[in-house]
Amino acid sequence: MSERAPVVTIDGPSGAGKGTISQLLAQHLGWQLLDSGAIYRVLALAAIHHNVELENEESITLLAAHLDVKFLTGNDTDPVQVILEGEDVTTDIRTQECSNAASKVAAFPRVREALLRRQRAFKTAPGLIADGRDMGTVVFPSAPAKLYLTASAEERAQRRYNQLQDKGFDVNIERLLSEIIERDDRDMNRPVAPLVPAEDALIIDTSGKGIDEVLALALNFINQKLSDTN
């Protein structure tokens, strides 16, 4: 069944709207969803749950190969639920402990290779929306429809600022902007799987655009690409 399941990849920098659009597309199409950005955090949490030493590459690799994780979409306003071994860990994977552990396990080449295969296993009928940074270039290079969402650093900083303000955090927008620019430079110039649009991706600049407008652009492109492959 997986061979016949189409994949839509959605790549781009943080704050460009990938998560929101990916969730809405998965809901609209009734497809599976892969949030690749959460995968390493989920693996780290699984290691903590199973008392696996984070420095043990062999054990972490084995855990990665059999990682039991699902991403569930609710309604438009609910965040994507991350399910690890049947348990909702959506909040748990966002802790600082989990973040630190994720950085450790991500450093192992064999772990990265195992998770690459695990991510590809998400390709099941009726289809997959793959949200990440290298979905269209590395993980699913043969996907029939590839999107690359971007926005100005200033707009992404403002979006992040608004999110944190809504949660009651006191933040400095200039610092957020500086961090975004630094991360962009790091991601786009890293030697392995740099953050770049796939050659055949539709690039959508979400600056100044509403969610409905971006969703319509994405759906029109996806429908066109899928009709071309049938």
Curated annotation (Swiss-Prot):
Matches recorded under Pfam families: Cytidylate_kin
InterPro entries assigned: Cytidylate_kin (IPR003136), Cytidylate_kinase_dom (IPR011994), P-loop_NTPase (IPR027417)
Alphabetical GO biological process terms: nucleobase-containing small molecule interconversion; pyrimidine nucleotide metabolic process
Record-linked SUPFAM superfamilies: P-loop containing nucleoside triphosphate hydrolases
Positions contributing to ATP binding: 12-20
Keywords: ATP-binding, Cytoplasm, Kinase, Nucleotide-binding, Transferase
Enzyme class, broadest EC rank: transferase
EC number(s) stated in the UniProt entry for this protein: 2.7.4.25
GO MF term (any one): CMP kinase activity
CDD domains: CMPK
Subcellular location: Cytoplasm
Catalytic activity field: CMP + ATP = CDP + ADP; dCMP + ATP = dCDP + ADP
GO cellular component: cytosol
Broad class of the protein's primary localization: cytoplasm
Family: Belongs to the cytidylate kinase family. Type 1 subfamily.
Descriptive protein name: Cytidylate kinase
Source species of the chain: Shewanella baltica (strain OS155 / ATCC BAA-1091)
Gene assigned in the entry: cmk
